[in-house]
């Protein structure tokens, strides 16, 4: 059997990176699609400002639940990556669009939670998928995917900055992007020359890993960083919108669009 060429010479590696980066860019817009139009939802359902953050928080909770379930069920090894990604993206697109059918905040939060669950099959699998195409430059490839999904999360704010883009256009644009991501991966992705061997979930290793001081410190640092980052991403757009309204009460929709454009730039910068 002829060994595969080294990853810095494989002819299809950059195509795979471009395809997965574009898929993440399109698919991750589901995350903040509710937050981008939170002021409109608040006016529609008459909930307090304290509840606005839940439109994003429940997505994160759903993502955590979905990731944990995926790990326990070993989905990344049981289900082919292309299928897992595509089905998750389609499910997320549907759950996100169904928010438009909600008549009150609790129903919307349920759909947003399910959206987060589905995103657990869009974000983590893509990192494993691209790693099968790279070895020496794996860090560059994974970093590119993370950068693409970061910009993708910010896209709903860019859509909201377009004149006339309210709740339905922003929500449906995010769902359409996720469907596009599913189509890209389903039709265009193939596993790379460096696949990972399937491994069952090993309960016996949980205590061993959790007992490692370096793992605990690294995990605590990562959790703290993510807490800070997502709190800032949720707070900043609301802060910008409130600042514009306080500075120029007559700005109206134009000021809201300007705040969304700045929010997009800030979130996309990471």
List each language-model region with its residue ranges.
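Extracytoplasmic gate region of multi-pass secondary transporters
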Residues: 34-38, 215-267
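Cytoplasmic helix-loop-helix junction between adjacent transmembrane helices
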Residues: 111-148
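Conserved MFS/SLC helix-loop-helix module at the cytosolic interface between two early adjacent transmembrane helices
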Residues: 67-106
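Helix-loop-helix hairpin linking two adjacent transmembrane segments in secondary transporters
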Residues: 136, 144-189
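Juxtamembrane intracellular "pre-TM" segments in multi-pass secondary transporters
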Residues: 3-10, 190-221
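Central cavity-lining transmembrane alpha-helices of secondary-active solute carriers
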Residues: 57-73, 264-270
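Extracytoplasmic
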Residues: 15-49, 66-70, 232-240
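Short hydrophobic/alpha-helical segments at membrane-entry points of transmembrane helices
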Residues: 104-112, 217-218
């Amino acid at each position: 059997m002829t060994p595969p060429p080294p990853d810095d010479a494989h002819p299809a590696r950059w195509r795979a990176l471009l395809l997965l980066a574009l898929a993440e860019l399109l698919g991750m817009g589901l995350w903040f699609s509710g937050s981008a139009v939170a002021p409109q939802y608040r006016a529609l359902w008459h909930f307090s400002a304290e509840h606005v953050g839940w439109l994003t928080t429940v997505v994160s909770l759903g993502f955590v639940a979905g990731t944990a379930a995926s790990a326990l069920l070993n989905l990344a090894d049981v289900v082919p990556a292309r299928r897992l990604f595509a089905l998750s993206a389609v499910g997320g697109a549907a759950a996100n669009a169904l928010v438009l059918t909600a008549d009150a905040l609790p129903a919307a939060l349920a759909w947003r939670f399910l959206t987060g669950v589905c995103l657990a099959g869009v974000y983590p699998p893509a990192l494993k998928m691209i790693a099968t195409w790279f070895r020496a430059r794996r860090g560059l490839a994974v970093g590119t995917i993370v950068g693409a999904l970061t910009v993708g999360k910010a896209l709903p704010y860019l859509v909201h900055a377009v004149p006339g883009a309210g709740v339905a256009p922003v929500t449906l644009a995010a769902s359409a992007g996720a469907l596009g991501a599913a189509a890209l991966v389903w039709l265009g992705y193939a596993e790379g020359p460096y696949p990972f061997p399937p491994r069952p979930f090993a309960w016996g290793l949980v205590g061993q890993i959790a007992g490692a001081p370096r793992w605990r410190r690294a995990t605590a640092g990562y959790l703290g960083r993510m807490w800070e980052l997502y709190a800032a991403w949720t707070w900043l757009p609301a802060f910008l919108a409130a600042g514009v309204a306080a500075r120029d009460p007559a700005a109206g929709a134009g000021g809201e669009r300007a705040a969304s454009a700045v929010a997009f730039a800030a979130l996309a910068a990471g």
